[in-house]
UniProtKB/Swiss-Prot annotation:
It is found in: Cytoplasm. Its main location: cytoplasm. This is Protein TusC. PANTHER family: PROTEIN TUSC. It comes from Buchnera aphidicola subsp. Acyrthosiphon pisum (strain 5A). SUPFAM superfamilies: DsrEFH-like. Belongs to the DsrF/TusC family. One of its GO terms (biological process) is tRNA processing. Heterohexamer, formed by a dimer of trimers. The hexameric TusBCD complex contains 2 copies each of TusB, TusC and TusD. The TusBCD complex interacts with TusE. InterPro entries: DsrEFH-like, Sulphur_relay_DsrE/F-like, Sulphur_relay_TusC, Sulphur_relay_TusC/DsrF.
């Protein structure tokens, strides 16, 4: 069975990549059973709770990440270096329970996937 990794590497608001990525995950989950989600670079900002995008006239889609478990998507990973570069750490209260990996182990994990889709 093919394994698909979704990588979120952009900030959540201002562009629609994050929302489109989430929609793609929900669509593809009907076809592929092994899906994992990775947050790297500015993508780690997708994980922050209590965002208020309505102040910039954007829709708060990040709460939709919480229903990933209903689609049996439980492999969620985040880059430790990306967190630290943005003043965050794995003690922050995120919207998801994620495994924080160093850059090396994150790359090793990504190498196992048949397809990697970046948003």
């Amino acid at each position: 069975m093919k394994m698909v990794a979704f990588v979120f590497s952009h900030a959540p608001h201002g562009i629609s990549l994050g929302r489109e990525g989430l929609d793609a995950i929900f669509s593809i989950s009907l076809i592929f059973k092994k899906i994992s989600v990775f947050f790297i670079g500015d993508g780690v900002l997708q994980l922050i709770k209590n965002q208020q995008p309505e102040h910039i006239l954007a829709r708060n889609y990040t709460s939709s990440f919480s229903i990933l478990s209903l689609y049996n998507i439980k492999d969620l990973y985040c880059c430790k270096a990306s967190l630290l570069e943005r003043g965050l750490n794995n003690n922050n209260n995120f919207i998801l329970n994620i495994d924080v990996l160093d850059s090396y182990n994150l790359r090793l994990k990504l190498d196992n996937y048949d397809a990697i889709i970046n948003f």
